[in-house]
Design a protein with these regions (language model features):
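Structural signature of Gram-negative outer-membrane beta-barrels, strongest in the C-terminal barrel
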Residues: 237, 329, 333, 356-480, ...
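Outer membrane beta-barrel strand-and-loop segments of large Gram-negative receptors
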Residues: 314-322, 356-368, 449, 466-528, ...
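C-terminal beta-signal and adjacent terminal beta-strands/loops
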Residues: 569, 578-594, 614, 621-682
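Flexible loop and strand-edge segments within Gram-negative outer membrane beta-barrel domains
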Residues: 31, 221, 239-318, 352, ...
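Gram-negative outer-membrane beta-barrel transporters
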Residues: 374-380, 477-479, 502-588
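Periplasmic N-terminal accessory/gating domains of Gram-negative outer-membrane beta-barrel systems
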Residues: 56-148, 165
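Transmembrane beta-barrel wall of Gram-negative outer-membrane proteins
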Residues: 181-203, 217-252, 265-287, 325-328, ...
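Surface-exposed extracellular loop regions of Gram-negative outer-membrane beta-barrel proteins
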Residues: 296, 345-347, 408-456, 475-501, ...
């Protein structure tokens, strides 16, 4: 049994804040929820202002207004949009150093994460503590747990798209946030009446103040990152919009292990450039995008007797076109993938190996169409088909991915039922079980054939109290085929004849689950609570016996998110995560052989980490608000409940004794992370 260590007063405050999502409903108790009244020929129309920032569409997608993050708890000074996406139903919460995003039981590599429709790869800063997305540069986040239309990219999992503002600011405006370990800012510059330049940047100086405390046990860590966004928006008339997007970011981390006397260095980063044109006339919308997106990492380890380097990367050049008119949508997308798989270079006393840095090139093309039409009263049908062709060397693969959604809207809510087939032609794998940047991308080929999935999902959504309290319940089921697992060890990189193809095995899996969510959308207190029950099972014949849970599976998860506008100056936010532990492979016993410690492990992923519980809280004080200008302070505490959650288990040696114990990210003397940020908006 796990007990949440919260002091009585803090516990009462937390319970009051979260329970208010359900029980703080009367209008007389909510000053910010004042009804607007207009009189039309003797008829009184009452409209209630929706203050919640989460919106749902009829197909099961969600849109999150990123101004929601202003009042939420911050980690290391950042309120990260991807972190808050993990609090939505069907999305799993990560532990502190897991950089993955797991949607409806799928792996991290199954997701499509993009900026205005352009894919980004490996979107983490600080090993997943927050992402590459600077929230002040974007207006909203669009999320879908699965492919609900044929226009969705060739991915088996969920989809996240960071979207630009729809309108020109018309004046100089911006915001700046300064914290103890990082700062960030955004500036909107009008260039005449029809054009605007948006500049954003972030940088970390964590080593300057916290270098002496950045340790995992006795191992020192040095870390830094920076990123930048540039968007140029031009709207010459009501029919045309052009924009250019740029993103660039770099991370660097050094890790020194005193006991083992080695130095590990890791650098990774993204680049993305896109040119976009949107044309609208008489109900027809045409959008075209040409883009380049690139990800690369540089990993090296040095010891007195050897040196190891493992660079890898992926670059895409692509073009996308879409047409929309009325109930019809159609389009095409073509991309050239240039992939550098991980090819280690070793130098040492035992051997020196230099493998050629071979790049693998492949092309991927798609044509799609969607149509939505009424089949009966209150019943609509959305059907779509995506035709794909993928080529690499002398091999070609063809597929047809249909999607069908049935929408029924009686007088008491909306029902949705969706079935789809999806193919994916890129794989991500590596030594890490927590999606570290050392993992690498691979193209499908004649040996590693494309993966695919069959999916079925359903959802019911209704207003328990119209406009105020909304309930949604969903089910999903997916069958996954040609899933890849990497079974190599670090020793093969150093001492063996390394070939990543020899360490890849193929199998299949199935994901299924239930998602429940209740959202309070009006009043001073808004937010949501959600519960997910799900399984993600895998089977690799000939390698592991039977069926086992995927390494990211959390069977149970409860999330609560709340914001409270306490007055003109003060606002408060809180998030609570209570989730089951993820699987790991426990050892059966250890033994010494010729002076070497060897371990015999049990069944694959047969153990579980302890329950994951984390409470984050924040308070925002608006010091000055005048004439469109605002300044204030944000105080946040990460892991305010002071719980030591497990990252993973590992072998330790202490005082001549070997033992197996969990690694925990926060020190015993400071099991929480406070942060303070000063911000200015103008």
């Amino acid at each position: 049994m796990h007990i949440l260590p919260i002091r009585p007063k803090a516990g009462r405050l937390l319970i009051s804040l979260l329970c208010s999502l359900l029980f703080t409903l009367p209008a007389h108790a909510q000053e910010a929820d004042t009804a607007g009244v207009k009189e039309l020929q003797g008829v009184e129309v009452v409209g209630r202002h929706v203050t919640g920032k989460l919106r749902h569409d009829s197909l099961g997608g969600m849109s999150l207004d990123l101004s929601f993050l202003d009042d939420m708890p911050r980690i290391a000074g950042n309120a990260d949009p991807i972190r808050y996406t993990q609090l939505l139903p069907s999305v799993q919460t990560n532990s502190e150093l897991d950089a993955g995003l797991y949607v409806q039981g799928c792996d991290n590599a199954h997701n499509g994460v993009s900026i205005n429709g352009v894919q980004l790869y490996d979107i983490q800063h600080i090993l997943g503590i927050f992402s590459v997305f600077n929230p002040s540069h974007y207006s909203r986040l669009q999320f879908a747990g699965s492919a609900f239309t044929a226009s969705a990219a060739n991915r088996l999992g969920g989809f996240i798209d960071m979207q630009r503002p729809d309108t020109l600011a018309g004046r100089v405006k911006g915001e700046l946030s300064v914290g103890l370990i990082s700062s960030q800012g955004t500036l909107h510059l009008p260039l005449g009446g029809k054009s605007e330049l948006i500049l954003s940047g972030r940088g970390a100086y964590i080593n300057l103040l916290y270098g002496r405390w950045l340790k995992v046990e006795e191992s020192a860590i040095r870390y830094s990152f920076c990123d930048a966004n540039v968007t140029w928006l031009y709207r010459p008339n009501a029919h045309n919009t052009l924009w250019l997007d740029f993103y660039g970011g770099n991370d660097r981390m050094d890790y020194q292990e005193d006991g083992e006397k080695y130095d590990a260095r890791l650098g990774w980063g993204n680049r993305m450039v896109s040119m976009n044109w949107e044309w609208k006339r008489q109900g027809l919308v045409l959008r075209q995008t040409a883009y380049m997106t690139r990800y690369g990492n540089r990993f090296s380890i040095e010891r007195p007797d050897f040196r190891l380097r493992m660079p890898s990367g992926i670059t895409d050049y692509g073009y996308r076109l879409s047409l929309r008119r009325g109930r019809w949508t159609a389009g095409t997308e073509w991309a050239l993938h240039s992939i550098r798989p991980q090819q280690p270079e070793t130098e040492g006393e035992r051997q020196t190996t230099t493998l050629s840095a071979t790049r693998r090139h492949s092309t991927e093309g798609s044509l799609w169409a969607d149509c939505k039409f009424a089949v009966a009263r209150n019943v609509e049908l959305l059907g779509g088909l995506r035709a794909n062709v993928y080529t690499i060397r002398r091999s070609a693969f063809f597929s047809a991915d249909p999607v069908l959604s049935l929408l029924w809207t009686p007088g008491y809510g909306q029902f949705r039922l969706t079935a789809n087939v999806k193919h994916q032609y890129l794989f991500r794998t590596g030594l890490s079980a927590v999606n570290l940047p050392t993992d690498f991308w691979l193209p499908a080929d004649e040996r590693l054939r494309p993966q695919y999935a069959y999916g079925l999902s359903g959802e019911y959504r209704t207003d328990l109290i119209p406009g105020r309290l909304q309930l949604s319940a969903g089910l999903y089921y997916k069958r996954l085929y040609r899933q890849t697992e990497y079974i190599g060890t670090p020793f093969e990189l150093i001492y063996g004849d390394y070939d990543y193809r020899k360490n890849l095995i193929s199998g299949k899996g199935k994901n299924y689950g239930l998602d429940l969510m209740i959202e309070k959308r009006t009043g001073r207190i808004t937010g949501w609570m959600s519960y997910s029950l799900g399984r993600a099972l895998r089977r690799y014949p000939g390698r592991f016996s039977g069926t086992f849970p995927a390494g990211h599976e959390r069977i149970h998860e409860f999330n609560a998110v709340a914001t409270w506008k306490a007055g003109r100056r003060w606002s408060f936010g809180a998030t609570l995560v209570w989730a089951g532990g993820t699987p790991f492979t426990p050892p059966s016993y250890f033994y010494l052989q010729n002076g070497n410690l060897l371990s015999q492990f049990g069944d694959y992923n047969s153990g579980r980490l302890s329950t994951y519980i984390r409470l984050d809280v924040s308070a925002t004080c608006r010091i000055k608000v005048h004439g469109g200008r605002e300044s204030g302070l944000n105080f946040s505490v990460y892991n305010a409940n002071c719980r030591h959650n497990d990252l993973f288990w590992r072998l330790k040696f202490n005082d001549g004794q070997y033992y197996y114990a969990p690694l925990r990210p926060l020190p015993k003397k400071l099991p929480f992370l406070p942060s303070i940020n000063y911000y200015i908006k103008f």
